[in-house]
Amino acid sequence: MERPLRIGIIAGELSGDTLGEGFIKAVKQQYPDAEFVGIGGPKMIAQGCESLFDMEELAVMGLVEVLGRLPRLLKVKAQLVKYFTENPPDVFIGIDAPDFNLRVELDLKNAGIKTVHYVSPSVWAWRQKRIFKIEAATNLVLAFLPFEKAFYDKFNVPCEFIGHTLADAIPLQSDKASAREILGLEQDKQWLSVLPGSRGSELKMLSQPFIETCKKLHQKFPDIGFVVALVNQKRREQFEQAWKEHAPELDFKLVDDTARNVITASDAVMLASGTVALECMLLKRPMVVGYRVNAVTAFLAKRLLKTKYVSLPNILADTELVKEYLQDDCTPDNLFDEVSRLLESDNREMLDKFTEMHHWIRKDADQQAANAVLKLIEK
C-alpha cells in the first residue's frame, strides 16, 4: 500500500500558525490522509500537525532576547534537522521566521530534501544580497505580492506569487455601520481612526504628532470623533500618557480591538506604516501614513532601503497613491492638511485603485500555496 504524503512544516509565530492552518486544510482537500510534522501552534495542531517542539520556543524578538535564547535555538534546530534527515518528508516548508527557517532549509536541501519558504523576507526592500542565501536554501519561495515575484525572477530564483491571505480574508466591500455598532460609535458622525503602531518605539515617536494633528482637526471640524486602536494594555498606557500631556481636553475613544474594526468604522485613517496600511487599502478607507524612527535607524534606512515608498499600497501601485510623511515631514501641519483633504473629498480615484489592487492580490492564497507545493513534490 502506498504511504501517505508526508510534509515537514515549521511555523515560528502566531501569524505563521494561521498560514499553516490554511495550507494544511487546502492540502487535505486533495490528500485527506497527508501527514504534517514539525513545529506548529494551536491552529496547526488542531488540523492534525504533530508538533515536535512548542512554537513559543521560536517566537523571540529583539537582539538581546535572541542572544539569550541562542544555545536553545541552535539545539532545537540541530534536533529538527536530525529528525527530518532520518525521516525525510516529501517536502519541507518553513513559514516565515527566516532567521531560523532558512538555516533549517539549507541543511535539508543539502541532504536532498525539497524545501519551500512560505512568505518572502523583504529582500526587495533592503539587504538584497540575502536572495543568494534564499536561493541556496530553497527549491521554491511562496510570495504574497506580485512585485516580490518580479524581484525573484530577476535573479532566476524559483518563486510563485500566490496572492495575499489578507486579501482573501477581507471582503471586497466592508460594512461601516456594523463596525460602528460593534465599537459603540455614533453612526451619524465623522470618525478618524488613529493607528500609532504596535511597538513601544512607534508610539514614542508618533503619539505626539498624531495627537497634535487631532487637536488641529478638532478646531476645524468640531464634531469629528477620534477612535484609536491599541494592541495591548502597555500601548494603551503609553498613549494615555501622551494624551494627558499634549491634549487632555480632547476626547479620544480608545479601543483594545483589532485594527480591522477600527479602520472599517472610520471615514479616514491616520496610521503608522506597516501591514496595517495594506489592511486599510483592502478595507477601502482613505489614509495618510506618518512615520518617524530614531536618528540612527533613519540614517541606516536611507542607505539600505531600496524602495521609493515605505507603505505597501504605494509599493504595490508603484506610485504615491497614499501620502507618506516620514521623519521631519511627519508634522502636525502636514498630517492636518492631508487628513482635512481626505475628509472633504470623495477620494474616488484612490478608492477605485484600492479595489483594483484588492482584485490583483485576491487569489485564494491557501489553495495556491497547496497547489504550488504539490506540483513541486511531483517534479
Curated annotation (Swiss-Prot):
EC numbers for this chain: 2.4.1.182
UniProtKB keywords: Glycosyltransferase, Lipid A biosynthesis, Lipid biosynthesis, Lipid metabolism, Transferase
Ranges in a coiled coil: none
Keyword Cell wall biogenesis/degradation: no
Cited function: Condensation of UDP-2,3-diacylglucosamine and 2,3-diacylglucosamine-1-phosphate to form lipid A disaccharide, a precursor of lipid A, a phosphorylated glycolipid that anchors the lipopolysaccharide to the outer membrane of the cell.
GO BP of this protein: lipid A biosynthetic process
InterPro entries the record matches: Glyco_trans_19 (IPR003835)
NCBIfam families hit by this protein: lpxB
Catalytic activity: a lipid X + a UDP-2-N,3-O-bis[(3R)-3-hydroxyacyl]-alpha-D-glucosamine = a lipid A disaccharide + UDP + H(+)
GO cellular component terms attached to this protein's record: membrane
Molecular functions per Gene Ontology: lipid-A-disaccharide synthase activity; phospholipid binding
Biochemical pathway: Bacterial outer membrane biogenesis; LPS lipid A biosynthesis
Keyword Cytoplasm: no
Domain of life: Bacteria
Protein name: Lipid-A-disaccharide synthase
Organism: Vibrio campbellii (strain ATCC BAA-1116)
Enzyme class: transferase
Family as reported in the entry's similarity comment: Belongs to the LpxB family.
